Amino acid sequence: MRYLVDTHTHTIVSGHAYTTFLENVQEASNIGLKVLGTTDHGPSMPGGPNLFYFNNFKVMPRKLKGVTLLHGCEANIIDFKGMLDIPDFTQKKLDVIIASLHDVCIRPGSVEENTEALINVMENPYVDILGHIGNPSFPINEEVVVKKAKEKNVLIEINNGSFVSRKGSEETCKKVANLCKKHKVNIIVGSDSHVCFQIGRFPKADNMLKEIGMPEELIINNEENKILEYLKNKGKLKDLNLD
């Protein structure tokens, strides 16, 4: 399958990634992506940016080198109540927010605690995507989370990077994907790139989705406008004309 969108990418601003914003945009353009999300880690990630970075996205272009640019954040869930490490004032300015659990920002809890964190964060209207919930370091009740995502219109990410960097993720990601298929929940495939050469490349995630027969209509990033319409319907991207 051809993917035209990657909403989960990092720049050197994240502290442990290796390419700049412009290098990422150039690579996205080179490989034919139509939409690129820059979603650097929130400030509680060691080495991550401060809030001024996220509050200053107004200086950034909306389009560059033929690519529509989404300016967002992979925000860290910092407690089991679903609190994020960026305030509402910042959240409402962003085009896209991925909410993720990272063990350097919150201790892994029980299945019940981890599930509660994801359920609670989906009550936040600014959250668009749940990041890498197939991470076995944070065991969850996958079916409860997937059903809640459908109720709250939150996208479930299938994270290609998890297949490599988070040991044991392959089976949990497949379980999540099968539940999304069962309950007809929209998914988005993300590279979680930390260097530009990973952008728009989802081979392991794509192979798994083909294996389980994921319906293409449930995959948000196989068309340019699906993600843009999704975000506009949530009241975002007011400056972007889709006509």
UniProtKB/Swiss-Prot annotation:
Its cofactor is Zn(2+). The keyword Metal-binding applies. Zn(2+) 1 binds at residues 8, 10, 74, 192. It holds the Pfam family PHP. It is an enzyme of class 3 (hydrolase). Binds 3 Zn(2+) ions per subunit. Keywords: Hydrolase, Metal-binding, Zinc. InterPro entries: Phosphatase_YcdX_put, PHP_dom, PHP_phosphatase, Pol/His_phosphatase_N, Pol/histidinol_Pase-like. Zn(2+) 3 binds at residues 74, 102, 132. One of its GO terms (molecular function) is zinc ion binding. CDD domains: PHP_HisPPase_Ycdx_like. Belongs to the PHP family. This is Probable phosphatase CLD_1129.
